[in-house]
């Protein structure tokens, strides 16, 4: 009688099941972790973020504003224009502080948790709606801003921000709103440096036609959106000090109330 042969068993037996089970366990853990991340409690995260800010005295950048920085070309023509803009320093001796302050009427100082923002309408600063040439009358006002900056703690950082409205650019050398806003912010920053502000405290950003403060549905609102902002940022230790100095300089009537 013929002997039956046993079926050949896999040499590895059931060993494959162990690593396969481990793989499934890891895959399950991954999906649980992904679900936990997606279902995170935003209020708890914000509370934790606030506590870390207090601990490290860190002033975060507003999340809603994401600038695009455009570096203007460093041309000889630009240097000549900058020189002509600051070619009349002698007149400053005949200007009183009140007269200089009147040149900046229309500017707005806003105090925030991260520092202060001085908003300057572009129709005050520049020759026309699509120009980056600073009005000669405003040079003394920018000089005054530079002197005020020099009174602030050295840890204060100043970011000059350029904004435009959404009017299409026609018959201008600028290819985009970002480029126009960048050149404007850059020029204001250069004048601040000329009047003695430490370059290490300065930077500039361009937001183009993004982040409007009013709907672009009227001439008045477009003038509000077409602006340069000087953002004074600092840590919690110097916050009350810069608020006090800037309020005293730009909003003196507040101190009298």
UniProtKB/Swiss-Prot annotation:
InterPro entries: Bact_OuterMem_StrucFunc (IPR050330), MotB-like_N_dom (IPR025713), OmpA-like (IPR006665), OmpA-like_sf (IPR036737). The chain crosses the membrane at residues 17-37. Disulfide bonds: none annotated. One of its GO terms (cellular component) is bacterial-type flagellum stator complex. The keyword Metal-binding does not apply. It is found in: Cell inner membrane. Its main location: membrane. One of its GO terms (molecular function) is identical protein binding. SUPFAM superfamilies: OmpA-like. It comes from the Bacteria. Residues 74-100 are annotated as: Disordered. It holds the Pfam family OmpA. NCBIfam families: PRK08457.1 (NF006285). Each stator complex is composed of 4 MotA and 2 MotB subunits. 2 A subunits and 1 B subunit are thought to form a single ion channel, so that each stator complex contains two channels. Belongs to the MotB family. This is Motility protein B. It comes from Helicobacter pylori (strain ATCC 700392 / 26695). The gene is motB.
